[in-house]
């Protein structure tokens, strides 16, 4: 199967999954990002999905448990490794959030204004991050990789 055909089938399966299950998992948003969204996956590429849970309805531990459950169900369904990013505006990961929110393909959106708001926040965060310069970004990345 050609990679573009495989990509379209994958997106269709993911959209069906999230349309059927988003409410059960208390999701407001699910986006495909990374190599599959960009159209440049390798045969062994994992599937990167960003999710945003309904605000104020579940705690951090329940979110982690739901991510494990979603991951297991998706991996069984699509026969690929799945990596899920929880979108949490309180955490600062501007590059990852920017990639997921701005370049991602919507799989499930309960409220388009929420997606718009999160995208605008990601763009502003990235602009702030970029304005500090490459040297600062490299230092920050180095600290992050060292676990500091």
Kindly label every feature range from the protein language model.
Residues 57:
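Short acidic, S/G/P-rich loop/turn micro-motifs used as interaction or catalytic elements
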Residues 50-54:
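Short hydrophobic/aromatic beta-strand micro-patches
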Residues 33-35:
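Glycine-rich beta-strand-to-loop/alpha-helix junction loops that act as flexible
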Residues 1-29, 38-39, 43, 60-148:
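Catalytic core of pol beta-like nucleotidyltransferases
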